[in-house]
Curated annotation (Swiss-Prot):
The lineage of its organism: Eukaryota, Fungi, Dikarya, Ascomycota, Pezizomycotina. This is Peptidyl-prolyl cis-trans isomerase-like 1. It comes from the Eukaryota. Coiled coil: none annotated. GO terms for molecular function: peptidyl-prolyl cis-trans isomerase activity. PPIases accelerate the folding of proteins. It catalyzes the cis-trans isomerization of proline imidic peptide bonds in oligopeptides. Residues 1-155 form the PPIase cyclophilin-type domain.
Length: 161
């Protein structure tokens, strides 16, 4: 059974489907953080057009965030999962085995990320919201000029939309 996580954001809602069998540790971390309200009121601190939107850092700096396992945890990279297009859900990191709470959604194919970032899901619905996020005005550090944030993230129960 796939796990879905729904996000209500300042720009609309989207839902992601987690690849539990491909990246079990990453998916457990992500779903547990969402369930605990960890992602609520967290901004999208980095948005790069035609590349990706990134969030998951409660400090909003791009340098914070921790996992349910303590500080950082190892990659779950699979050769059969690639950043082939828009809507890929992947962990942000600062090098091998440095996963915490930050994640991104691709806006286009990003093959240079293959083998470097754990892919653990995809956008199931609301991709237009993600695409609109990718068009917001940003400053020189790729930070949105007007705040874009997650209002609420939650695990979708079976049978619920």
């Amino acid at each position: 059974m796939a796990t879905d996580v729904a996000f209500d954001t300042s720009m609309g809602s989207f839902t992601v489907e987690l690849y539990n069998s491909h990246a079990p540790k990453t998916c457990k971390n992500f779903a547990t953080l969402a369930q605990r309200g960890y992602y609520n009121n967290v901004i999208f601190h980095r948005i790069i057009p035609n590349f990706m939107v990134q969030t998951g850092d409660p400090t909003g700096t791009g340098r914070g965030g921790s996992s349910i396992y303590g500080e950082k945890f190892e990659d779950e990279i699979r050769a059969d999962l690639k950043h082939t297009g828009a809507g890929i859900l992947s962990m942000a990191n600062s090098g091998p085995n440095t996963n915490g709470s930050q994640f991104f959604v691709t806006l286009a194919p990003t093959p240079w990320l293959d083998g470097k970032h754990t892919i653990f899901g995809r956008v199931k619905s609301g991709m237009r919201v993600i695409q609109r996020m990718g068009l917001v005005k940003t400053n020189g550090e790729d930070r949105p000029v007007d705040e874009v944030k997650i209002i609420r993230a939650r695990v979708v129960e079976e049978g619920e939309e």
